[in-house]
C-alpha cells in the first residue's frame, strides 16, 4: 500500500505538477531506501513542474548516517528554501558540514529558542523569529512546544 501511495504521489507530482507534498516525522522514512529514492526524485525534479516538497524531522542527525547519506544529501542540499530550527543534541561539526552552513549560522540555532530559526534562501541567510498572531495562538493550546 505504501508504495502505491508513493507511486500515485509521483505521478501527480511529476506529471501534473502544481502539487505540495509534506513529509512530517521524515526520520521514519530514512529506514526505507526505496521511499528515499522517491523523495529524492520529488525534490530534484518537482521544481520543473512547479511542485514543492516540505520535509520536517526532529532527528536531523539521522540524515547523516553513512548508509543513507547518498540519498539524504541531495534531499537536503537541493531545496531553494530551508528553515532550520534548534537541531538538538547532535555532532555540531557533522551537522554544519551536512547542512552547508557556517559556525555563525549554526550559532543562531544552537540553543532552543522558541520561534527562532535560520532561514536559507539560495545563498541568502536570515535569522527569523516566527510569531503567531493572537487569534492563531488559541489553536496551539497550552501543552508542549516550550
Label each region the model flagged.
Residues 1-108, 134:
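Conserved P-loop NTPase motor cores
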Residues 1-15, 107-146:
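Conserved P-loop NTPase motor module
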